[in-house]
From Swiss-Prot:
The gene is DEFB132. Residues 1-22 form the signal peptide. PANTHER family: BETA-DEFENSIN 123 (PTHR15001:SF3), BETA-DEFENSIN 123-RELATED (PTHR15001). The lineage of its organism: Eukaryota, Metazoa, Chordata, Craniata, Vertebrata. Belongs to the beta-defensin family. InterPro entries: Beta-defensin (IPR050544), Beta_defensin_dom (IPR025933). This is Beta-defensin 132. The keyword Disulfide bond applies.
Length: 96
């Protein structure tokens, strides 16, 4: 009976000492990340929470970058134009 009472007292003490967050406190409220010393695999550091801890967020929570939209095949038409200029220069060099 005394052993059971001792175990229960130890468990109660451990619940007060061990944090429930399990890996770090949250970063600021609008960021889906945790303050950690080292980021886990699949995470990146966004900013510093304090001098020794980084705000680590998963790649899936990061905003997607805005990429410019290409209109048609603009890059292919430029490539054809440079090839034509090269052919014209070759014909003028060989005919001279």
């Amino acid at each position: 009976m005394k052993f059971l009472l001792l175990v229960l007292a130890a468990l109660r003490f451990l619940t007060q000492v061990i944090p429930a967050s399990g890996g770090g406190s949250k970063c600021v409220s609008d960021t889906q990340g945790y303050c950690r010393t080292y980021c886990h695999q699949g995470e990146t550091a966004l900013f510093m929470c304090n001098a020794s801890r980084k705000c680590c967020a998963s790649y899936s929570f990061l905003p997607k970058p805005d990429l410019p939209q290409l209109i048609g095949n603009h890059w292919q038409s430029r490539r054809r134009n440079t090839q034509r200029k090269d052919k014209k220069q070759q014909t003028t060099v060989t005919s001279s």
